[in-house]
A protein has these predicted regions:
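Intrinsically disordered, charged low-complexity linkers and terminal tails
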Residues: 1-156
Length: 156
């Protein structure tokens, strides 16, 4: 799925790694975008587990076991509240899925989405948008959460 990204992952991965910010990446495939559903790929599942947000391995299949978690779309000039649904459908082997309410208004198929967290919310960044790159300046990123403050921010 990440191989379909319209934006190279290496540069943005380095940005977050240099700041010690845990990040996961998702790329909505054309089919997933149409259905507003994405596979919760292994690195995303690990990200959720490592941050104490969700453990898909312990989740049972079906709508009764869906978990909803607060989330936000990060825009260059504001943050828009949304939610993430983490679930395993009854079909097939219950492959883990994620659904972000309103995703279609925030991205296009094959856009690179970066997910960061302050452990209270998931923050979704459309890294395929040039305006989001500008908004990732450290002093702006720290407005999402103090966790994202780094030495560059403190120096300003």
């Amino acid at each position: 799925m990440l191989s379909m990204s319209d934006t190279p992952i290496e540069g943005v991965l380095k940005y977050f790694a240099d700041r010690g910010i845990s990040v996961a990446f998702l790329v909505p495939t054309p089919t997933g975008y149409k259905k507003s559903i994405m596979d919760a790929i292994a690195p995303f599942r690990s990200f959720l587990l490592e941050n104490g947000i969700h453990n898909y391995d312990e989740q049972k299949q079906g709508p009764d076991f869906k978990v909803t978690f607060p989330a936000c779309f990060v825009l260059p000039d504001k943050i828009v509240e949304t939610s993430a649904s983490l679930y395993r459908p009854c079909t097939k082997q219950g492959d883990p899925r994620v659904w972000f309410a309103g995703l279609k208004s925030y991205c296009n198929p094959c856009n690179l989405l970066g997910i960061v967290t302050d452990k209270k919310k998931l923050y979704i960044l459309n890294l395929s948008l040039p305006a989001i790159h500008e908004s990732l300046q450290p002093w702006k990123l720290s407005t999402i959460s103090p966790q994202f403050t780094d030495n560059e921010t403190e120096a300003q």
